[in-house]
Regions:
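Conserved ATP-binding subdomain of kinase catalytic cores across diverse folds
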Residues: 1-89, 113-118
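Conserved kinase catalytic-core segment
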Residues: 96-152
Length: 238
């Protein structure tokens, strides 16, 4: 664990604007003029590590930063992306089209959610956008109910009733589930080196991970337990 070399200093904070976000502490205005959704302590660690995993697997996520709060503590900041749409704001006639075109990405995200025990991948935890060439795409956000939120060893998320499995089943019912994309995302995660994972953990601010658990978490990636979980996830996403 470490002190942060280049955190973004927070100039002011405001109450969270998203009434249905149980894990969002508040919104911070950084010295860079941007707004950030603030997550603290173990939630901050889960968010930071999951952002690294998903980005390494080619999944778009919002810009992230370590925030130096007004009280001197460190928090995780996910930049609030303007001009993007959540699923609820999509026109009803367009929702199926968005789902179909984004299905490879959504399937990939859900597969990784299984791996890191994210139980809360509902349709409100995607941001949708249109690229320059008119293609539809999406990014993943909110990993508050993943990794360090769950019990340890991690539960078999894909076997349980939760928002993530509901999203997966919904895609399957619509025949939009992309097993090839889901499989590839898991193989991409498997290619992340244990040393890289350990470096990500070591770079977190002191106090974000419970004392004594850092070694357990650091050595988990690539372990026998991890490999078994990976194989179970590969079977689940077929």
């Amino acid at each position: 664990m470490s002190e942060q070399l280049f955190p973004i200093r927070v100039r002011a904070t405001a109450p969270k604007p998203f009434g249905n976000s149980a894990d969002l502490a508040e919104v911070a205005i950084g010295e860079d003029g941007m707004d950030y959704a603030v997550k603290t302590v173990h939630i901050a660690a889960s968010e930071a590590l999951c952002y690294q995993i998903y980005a390494a697997c080619g999944i778009a996520v919002p810009h992230k930063a370590t925030l130096l709060m007004i009280d001197g503590s460190y928090a995780f900041g996910s930049r609030i992306e303007r001009g993007l749409s959540d699923y609820a704001s999509c026109a009803p006639t367009e929702k199926s089209e968005w789902l179909k075109e984004c299905s490879p990405i959504i399937s990939s995200i859900c597969a990784l959610d299984f791996l890191i025990a994210n139980e809360d991948r509902h349709m409100g935890n995607f941001l949708f956008f249109t690229g320059l060439n008119g293609r539809k795409s999406c990014m993943a956000l909110d990993f508050s109910r993943a990794l360090l939120y769950a019990s340890w060893p991690l539960p078999d998320t894909w076997k349980l009733h939760n928002n993530t499995t509901s999203t997966e089943k919904g895609l399957r019912q619509l025949h939009f589930w992309d097993s090839a994309a889901a499989t590839q995302s898991l193989l991409s995660a498997a290619a992340i080196k244990q040393s890289t994972w350990a470096n990500w953990i070591d770079a977190l601010p002191t106090g974000w991970i419970t004392a004594g658990f850092e070694t357990t978490l650091s050595t988990w990636w690539g372990s026998n337990d991890f490999q078994k979980r990976l194989q179970d996830c590969l079977s689940a996403v077929k």
